[in-house]
């Protein structure tokens, strides 16, 4: 029987000035959104969501992104940027923060409020939070970000 997720080959070193995009979930599925950007030996995580199981997953409550590819590099993470407060974008953040509890979190006021509630549910302490709004520009290590509004089914 073949494994549903075959082992991927090792990724070579990142060329100087190169940007690596590592999707850890949410690619080809609706849910479990998590993308890591690697640049100059630093990492930026965008979203950290869960996937809700289907009927052929009895007894499974949540499906998390695979933290394995970055687990030994969590000290290189500049921040976790949350695009909005839906569970498929923030639901796995408490599990990531159990691995490294001081990762700065960036998001809108509403998104960070929803995350705070989730952290209390998991009995985790608050981490450094940076509230951003549409039009804001910030730098996180070597990463420059600009926040733009999009139409979606959440008011933020």
Please place each PLM-identified region on the residue numbering:
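Metallo-beta-lactamase
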Residues: 1-22, 38-49, 110-155
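Conserved phosphate-coordination/catalytic loops
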Residues: 61-64, 87, 151-154
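Pre-active-site segment of Zn-dependent metallo-hydrolases
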Residues: 27-32, 39-82, 94-103, 107-111, ...
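Catalytic core of the metallo-beta-lactamase
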Residues: 17-24, 30-39, 136-156
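Histidine-centered divalent metal-coordination motifs
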Residues: 79, 83-90, 152
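Generic recognition of flexible, low-complexity loop/linker segments
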Residues: 8-10, 23-24, 33, 93
């Amino acid at each position: 029987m073949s494994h549903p997720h075959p082992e991927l080959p090792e990724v070579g070193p990142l060329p100087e000035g190169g940007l690596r995009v590592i999707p850890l979930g949410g690619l080809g599925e609706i849910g479990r959104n998590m993308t890591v950007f690697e640049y100059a030996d630093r990492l930026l995580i965008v979203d950290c969501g869960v996937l809700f199981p289907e009927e052929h997953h009895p007894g499974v409550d949540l499906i998390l992104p695979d933290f394995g590819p970055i687990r030994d590099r969590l000290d290189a993470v500049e921040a976790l940027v949350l695009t909005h407060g839906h569970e498929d974008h923030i639901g796995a953040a408490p599990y990531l923060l159990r691995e490294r509890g001081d990762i700065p979190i960036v998001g809108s006021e509403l998104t960070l409020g929803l995350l705070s509630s989730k952290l209390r549910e998991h009995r985790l302490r608050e981490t450094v939070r940076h509230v951003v709004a549409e039009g804001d520009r910030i730098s996180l290590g070597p990463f420059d970000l600009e926040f733009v509004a999009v139409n979606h089914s959440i008011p933020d």
